A protein has these predicted regions:
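N-terminal leader segment of winged-helix/HTH proteins
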Residues: 1-55
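Charged, amphipathic alpha-helical coiled-coil/dimerization segments
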Residues: 6-8, 90-146, 150
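Helix-centric, low-specificity signal for extended rod-like, repetitive segments
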Residues: 19, 30, 80-81, 93, ...
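Amphipathic alpha-helical dimerization/coiled-coil segments
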Residues: 27, 31, 42-45, 127-164
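Generic structural concept
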Residues: 29-36, 57, 61, 65-68, ...
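N-terminal helix-turn-helix DNA-binding core of bacterial DNA-binding proteins
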Residues: 40-85, 89, 94-95, 111, ...
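A general structural signal for short secondary-structure boundary/capping elements
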Residues: 82, 105-110, 156-162
Length: 169
């Protein structure tokens, strides 16, 4: 931890929340942090045991499942440096999970897509995650699950609006 780093640096242009919102925003911030922690803990024993995908690779493959993207597009969507995306995709290509192909729109850019092995691996990861979620949410009604999905979708869209990082390329 670097005590000289100010976590509020760069936030000067963002107005501070109204005092009446602070408690609610703190509750949302805590809930979001705990959701990430709990989801990771629910699925990490299976991932470690099976040598499965880490969270960044899982996110990258999930995004590429929708449609092929270039390194620059992946970096923009994931909010990480292109050199990091390049290293990550190189390992996944070497493992036979992704393949590069020429961009049909021309130019020198190459796109990435899942191979059949990559699709099977991603489907397996998704099954692990769905089993863990199914266990955690056992007893929730279909209506409650639909409402949770709707609110989380809305929350994600608000985060995208605030960050400028879009899941879509």
């Amino acid at each position: 931890v670097n005590a000289d780093v100010n976590p509020e640096e760069g936030l000067r242009a963002i107005p501070a929340p109204d005092e009446t919102e602070v408690a609610e925003l703190r509750a949302v911030e805590l809930a979001a942090m705990l959701i990430g922690r709990h989801l990771s803990l629910l699925t990490s024993p299976d991932r470690r045991r099976a040598g499965r995908l880490d969270r960044v690779s899982y996110t990258l493959l999930t995004r590429l499942e929708a449609d092929p993207l270039t390194l620059a597009e992946l970096g923009r969507v994931l909010g990480i440096d292109v050199s990091t995306v390049n290293r990550r995709t190189a390992g996944l290509v070497e493992a036979g999970v992704l393949e590069r192909f020429p961009d049909p729109d021309g130019g020198i850019a190459r796109r990435f897509r899942l191979t059949p092995v990559g699709r099977r691996l991603l489907a397996s990861e998704q099954r692990v995650n769905l089993r863990a979620l199914g266990t955690a949410l056992d007893g929730w009604s279909a209506e409650d699950l639909a409402e949770l999905a709707r609110m989380l979708g809305r929350f994600n869209h608000s985060l995208e609006d605030a960050s400028g990082l879009r899941w879509e390329a």
